[in-house]
Amino acid sequence: MHSVHDRSDRGGALAFLGAEAAPEQASRVGHAAYVTIHGHFYQPPRENPYLDDIEPQPGAAPYENWNERILAECYRPNAFARILDERGQVVQIVNNYEYLSFNLGPTLMSWLERHDVEVYRRILAADRNSARRLDGHGNAIAQPYNHVILPLANERDRHTQIRWGIADFVKRFQRRPEGMWLPEAAIDLPTVAALVEEGIQFAILAPSQAQRCRPMGSNDSEWHEVSNSQIDPTQPYRCFLPADDPSQPQRYLDIFFYDGPVSRDMGFNDVVDSSHQLVGRLAQCLQDRGDRPQLIHCATDGETFGHHKRDKERTLAFAFAYGLPQAGLSITNYGHYLSQHPPTWEVQLKPVTAWSCAHGVGRWERDCGCASESGLHQKWRQPLRQALNWLRDRLGEVYESKVSTYLRDPWAARDAYIDVILDRTPKQIDRFLQAHRSRELRANEVVDVLRLLEMQRNSQLMFTSCGWFFEELSRPEGVQILRYAARAIELAGDAASIDLETEFLERLQQAPSNCEEYGDGAEIYRQRVLSAIVSPRRIAAHYAIKSLFSSFSREAQIYSYTVEQLDADVPHRATIGGDTLALGRLLVKSSITQESHDLIYGVLHLGGWDFHCCIQPFPGQRRYEDIQARLFGCLDHRAQAAIALQSEFGREYYTLDSLISRDRHEIMRMLTHSTLGHLNRLYRKIYQDNYRVLLAFRRDDLPVPIELQAAASMTLNQRLALLMESLERNPERGHMLQQLQQVVTEAEELGCSLQLEEATASLNRLLRQQLWHILHARELAATAQPLLQLDCYLNVVEILRAPIDVDRAQEMYLACLSQHAVAATQTGASVPLSGLLALGNRLHINVNTCLERWVQQVS
């Protein structure tokens, strides 16, 4: 945790913020000293390609998946990075993205837009603010679409990856990118040429990727060999392409080679443990070069700040706000620096290189030894690459031959398909088809076009670099790219009636796994990939089973499918005893390919976990009504009902296990609710009857019988849950504080642990609701009641010692304070403002320092 606690000055936050001395080396440098820290923020696409959604990943616990976890540990903390005073109170919140040079991969940005729009908007705003500060040059740079190793891609895919990355960037940041971060910094001459052709001005590489350099305009004898990372990173270089026409100006890409030692220290040593160390380490890189401008810059995974190294986003925040300016280092970004100081040297690159592989790009195509620290081989890498290359080429042939019937230019259409990927509304799809079709298309032909384009999208995704990066093919990253391959194969079959899976599996057999239970890539595919396939029928079964417990609107969104109820009134349902039978007709339509399926379902719930759900195409209204009559006619005999269901629909059926995991878990909790209620009543009676016995055991320091201890723990936790439910339903019940305190006291007396997860979630919701009311109050008088409620809830937090999400509360509070503080000062409304200030103290915010800084900014 970075705070002023690290320093000797104890004169208050503002006194400290101006107290840190600039490192000695930096003081020797004049105005021409600049610094750029680049963060490569990226997560691989993790969505199930059939659902367009990430399924729960237990390894990310307590979060649902790894994106959620890294969002909480890194992306959000960097958008709201704290600077703390000597008491650990917040004195300032910094948006680190306003000062970092950064790239966020398109697949990550797409996920953020859907799952945390607040952080997403902070990132976009950071780029706008940095552009205003730096003459129109924003901090954000682009990235090829899904992190494909560009030197290993064919020419067509290389350009598509860059074009999709640029289009995604333009859509989000509303400007063209100046630079592009290359996946794994992998580069070769064709990649340089592709970047130049697509209008990219610069890239960032490792110093080990340079071969030789010389002053521009020198003769061939003046080349300096720098192949052992000796290149000077404090200036940019120009990489010229071979001239096709000597009479034309040479084309070029500008290159920044980041400082290797500093970048390694940031990732693997303690240089980011405090801003003093970070600023000092950067200042050490300055050279005594007279008036020549110098750029000190480093690059590392953005996840270093908060995910790999907890709380280190605070180190950045303090360095950006105070440390670097005081050290005489001007914070800039690559585009701005390049506009002010274009290269005076040129460079030649090594033939094929990357920043994380000493063997060129071997890590992504052969068993080169990288990632072999665990003792596992990577002999699977080359066969996997070969199998996917084969599949890519076959998919390309299918695509070109089939889509040419419908579209004027298949490959131009593929490049433009990014517009649909970014906006799948019917209006955008129609706009795309209008621009690229060669003739009027029927509905089934539109579906085939979209299938073929989605086939191509998945063929891109199956080359995501993470699939090769680690030691074993059966890891989630390897399985993920095989799932994209499976989806592409399925779409090819749907659109062109071709079977590519058989030969693909034969090729995967040549990819040996390190795990005996799999043996090879083909078996991994069978066990880990085929099980993830979600057909439209499974979506219908998912809907049918869940409809027994949840009410759906006439049209519902089930992941990437729209499910429309086609029955005239409502689905037909009957219950006898504990058995329930439901039948219905659905139109299941893919939001991605627009394909639709008219299906009927029959679902029989025989109590508990016993579900039988059958699906078939709609057989016509008369046949559908006959099925209803026969099935409902035998519901009073459960064995006959189950037999009749299979007789009408066929032997294939779906069970509770067929549900998508997130919803399955929800229904499992519902099914156990009544059982838990019965157990709670039983435990409560045992506890009440034996309360004094329990106290006697505790008083005499004897081991409490586990049965009695369990009864006490269950009862107290149930009381806590009921009290929190009541408080959330009726926030006026402040008298519950005494009852909550009694629960806590009894738990302490009896040595019981209270389970606070649900209570904490409830308190977080209540706190945000009241802060929202304060934020949107038009006048200070309207904040009085929400402030009283917040005071009550914070008392509950203290009683329970609940680990609330204080960060979110602080962020909302500071927005409230900045909005109302000036108005309160002008109107003299001291009572409401005093309440607001008191709340800030309870949320560990140094309100006086925040107010003082805002007043200074206004004045």
What kind of feature is each model-predicted range?
Residues 34-39, 43-156, 160-161, 174, ...:
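Short, well-structured secondary-structure segments
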Residues 12-85, 106-107, 223-265, 269-549, ...:
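Active-site and substrate-binding clefts of carbohydrate-active enzymes
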Residues 184-191, 210-214, 339-342:
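Beta-rich nucleic-acid/ligand-interaction surfaces
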Residues 121-139, 163, 175, 196-245, ...:
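Acidic, His- and aromatic-enriched active-site or binding-groove loops in soluble protein domains
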Residues 78-79, 94-95, 104, 112-116, ...:
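Extended, Lys/Arg-enriched charged tracts that mediate electrostatic binding to polyanionic substrates
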Residues 698-859:
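Extended alpha-helical scaffold segments
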Residues 158-182, 245-248, 283-297:
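CE4/NodB-like, metal-dependent polysaccharide N-deacetylase domain
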